[in-house]
UniProtKB/Swiss-Prot annotation:
Lipidation (S-palmitoyl cysteine): 402-403, 405
Regions that span the bilayer: 102-126, 138-163, 176-197, 219-243, 272-296, 325-350, 363-389
Chain's role: Non-specific receptor for endothelin 1, 2, and 3. Mediates its action by association with G proteins that activate a phosphatidylinositol-calcium second messenger system.
Cited SMART domains: 7TM_GPCR_Srsx (SM01381)
Organism this protein belongs to: Canis lupus familiaris
SUPFAM superfamilies: Family A G protein-coupled receptor-like
One GO term of the biological process aspect: vasoconstriction
Cytoplasmic face of the membrane: 127-137, 198-218, 297-324, 390-442
Disulfide linkage: 174-255
Protein name: Endothelin receptor type B
Domain of life: Eukaryota
Entry-annotated residues carrying Phosphotyrosine: 439
Annotated GO CC locations: plasma membrane
């Protein structure tokens, strides 16, 4: 008769059997194997699966709202872990995505061509024509340069991402693309604010003659605009990352604002991002423009009765520049309003647990796609607005586009030469007028 096995031997056999059974049970339940890179199921970041394929620039909060809803405490037994239920997916979102995929592609290609031609021509006009080198035009050139960077780098990658669905460009480009996009928008916003303030200073300070050349304060403004825009875009580069998801039986790499942020600041930024974008990148330029243009109008009405004939031409030129700046701000507001409106409506009135939410979600998706296209148009529409509003820019555009390969100074129109001479004569007449007033008052 053999001795019974020891207690340690029995425990060892039981442990081996338990490990084997747990491994088999885990494989049957479909648990993913360990891997070097994190793999998230679609339900962990967004549901339904159609949300994984939204183009860059769409509402990030639409993805956040699609997390599985938690079962109320009263509906689960005591001591049991919280369970989640997913609301039924909205089938209409797939049709909306397929419809706008090609619309976005056509609009992006149009913006790419018009934006490169228009902004490059605008920069060449200001660089070649000495009569156009002044404070407001240098700010407009800074705005055009920011739009040009966004068009060259962001738009081609965005179109590829929209059509190919997978992100093959790596983590570096995943962080660089949203960084450049936000920096470009920041340059646009701060440049419009600086232009509005500059127009008020030009009207309020009649002794401040607009001459040829870049004032030192304008150069400082441009440096500050670019530095602040780059700093404010850093959270985008920090927060965006690549995530691998399981989508319809295949693994897709997507680039988005990561659902889990490491630092408290980035968690706060992810939560308050939509409100921050709406307040700073949309409401701020409109509020500053409305404030300073109201002051400028009051100043012009107050001094209108004391205007002299010698100032008429000089005043007309300043009014034309003020009208041009106002049109740029108006175009900016119209282009960005749909996108910000969809984000705010999503944050305020959308309920992910509402069984009748699909109609509202379809409306918000359509508004979101329209907003993306309108925001892209803002990168190419500023040169067109300048061509339609300003006579001087219109003449320069015609001359520059007709003789792109030749020297602009040799082929500039006679009207521009006369405008420069007339501008200098007006400044000289204004100086004489101020001197005569000074001696007469003495």
């Amino acid at each position: 008769m053999q001795p019974p096995p020891s207690l340690c031997g029995r425990a060892l056999v039981a442990l081996v059997l338990a490990c084997g059974l747990s491994r088999i049970w885990g494989e049957e339940r479909g648990f993913p194997p360990d891997r070097a890179t994190p793999l998230l199921q679609t339900a962990e970041i967004m549901t339904p699966p159609t949300k994984t394929l939204w183009p860059k620039g769409s509402n990030a909060s639409l993805a956040r709202s699609l997390a599985p809803a938690e079962v109320p405490k009263g509906d689960r037994t005591a001591g049991s872990p919280p369970r989640t239920i997913s609301p039924p997916p909205c089938e209409g979102s797939i049709e909306i995505k397929e419809t706008f995929k090609y619309i976005n592609t056509v609009v992006s290609c149009l913006v790419f061509v018009l934006g490169i031609i228009g902004n490059s021509t605008l920069l060449r006009i200001i660089y070649k024509n000495k009569c156009m080198r002044n404070g407001p035009n240098i700010l407009i050139a800074s705005l055009a340069l920011g739009d040009l960077l966004h068009i060259i780098i962001d738009i081609p990658i965005t179109v590829y991402k929209l059509l190919a669905e997978d992100w093959p460009f790596g983590v570096e480009m995943c962080k660089l693309v949203p960084f450049i996009q936000k920096a470009s928008v920041g340059i646009t916003v701060l440049s419009l604010c600086a232009l509005s303030i500059d127009r008020y200073r030009a009207v309020a300070s009649w002794s401040r003659i607009k001459g040829i050349g870049v004032p030192k304060w304008t150069a400082v403004e441009i440096v500050l605009i670019w530095v602040v825009s780059v700093v404010l875009a850093v959270p985008e580069a920090v927060g965006f990352d690549m995530i691998t998801i399981d989508y319809k039986g295949r693994y897709l790499r997507i680039c988005l604002l990561h659902p889990t942020q490491k630092t408290a600041f980035m968690q706060f930024y992810k939560t308050a991002k939509d409100w921050w974008l709406f307040s700073f990148y949309f409401c701020l330029p409109l509020a500053i423009t409305a404030f300073f243009y109201t002051l400028m109008t009051c100043e012009m009405l107050r001094k209108k009765s004391g205007m002299q004939i010698a100032l008429n031409d000089h005043l007309k030129q300043r009014r034309e520049v003020a009208k041009t700046v106002f049109c740029l701000v108006l175009v900016f507001a119209l282009c960005w309003l749909p996108l910000h409106l969809s984000r705010i409506l999503k944050l305020t009135i959308y309920d992910q647990n509402d069984p009748n939410r699909c109609e509202l979600l379809s409306f918000l998706l359509v508004l979101d796609y329209i907003g993306i296209n309108m925001a892209s148009l803002n990168s190419c529409i500023n040169p067109i607005a300048l061509y339609l509003v300003s006579k001087r820019f219109k003449n320069c555009f015609k001359s520059c586009l007709c003789c792109w390969c030749q020297s602009f100074e040799e082929k500039q129109s006679l009207e521009e030469k006369q405008s420069c001479l007339k501008f200098k004569a007006n400044d000289h007449g204004y100086d004489n007028f101020r001197s005569s007033n000074k001696y007469s008052s003495s």
